[in-house]
């Protein structure tokens, strides 16, 4: 808790001895439909690249932290920026990184599947109108074609990771 309010916290531990290196306070830790109880979260896994830790909170807030000291380098409230909505049990999908892009489903009103630039969190592309699930996207090469695959509420959707162009959809 911070000032009496429950908060989601990202913690870095030493790989050598497990001691805490730093802790960064992120977002509110309120889980009214948490399934198990009010303390059932967060459920996402941070992604690490370019000396940074990227964290997507239960309430669709994306943070870039300095991997050395946990300082917040930038943050984006995806729900506010893109009209996203929080689903029951909050977000559970983790961000995925390849090269200079971070992939996620922000559950925005339109063009929900997106890639953001690691450097500043600005959109590289947004594509498709697909409702969020608790599934983390997967990068794969299938028949020689690199793709980012999302499980959504209605479909399995594959996109070109560089452009966001639809490769295939399975309902």
Regions found by a protein language model. Give the residues of each.
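Noncatalytic, solvent-exposed loop/strand surfaces
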Residues: 1-171
């Amino acid at each position: 808790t911070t000032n009496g309010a429950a908060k989601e916290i990202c913690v870095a531990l030493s790989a050598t001895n497990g001691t805490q290196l730093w802790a960064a306070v992120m977002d509110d830790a309120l889980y009214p439909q948490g399934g198990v109880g009010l303390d059932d979260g967060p459920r996402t896994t941070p992604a690490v690249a370019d000396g940074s830790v990227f964290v997507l909170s239960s309430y669709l807030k994306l943070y870039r932290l300095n991997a050395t000291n946990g300082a917040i380098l930038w943050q984006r409230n995806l729900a506010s920026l893109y009209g996203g909505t929080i689903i029951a049990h909050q977000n559970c999908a983790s961000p995925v990184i390849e090269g200079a892009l971070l992939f996620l489903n922000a559950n925005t009103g339109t063009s929900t599947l997106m890639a953001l630039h690691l450097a500043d969190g600005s959109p590289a592309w947004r594509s498709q109108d697909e409702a969020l699930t608790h599934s983390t996207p997967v990068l794969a090469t299938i028949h020689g074609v690199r793709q980012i695959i999302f499980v959504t509420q209605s479909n399995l959707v594959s996109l070109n990771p560089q452009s966001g162009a639809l490769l295939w959809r399975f309902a």
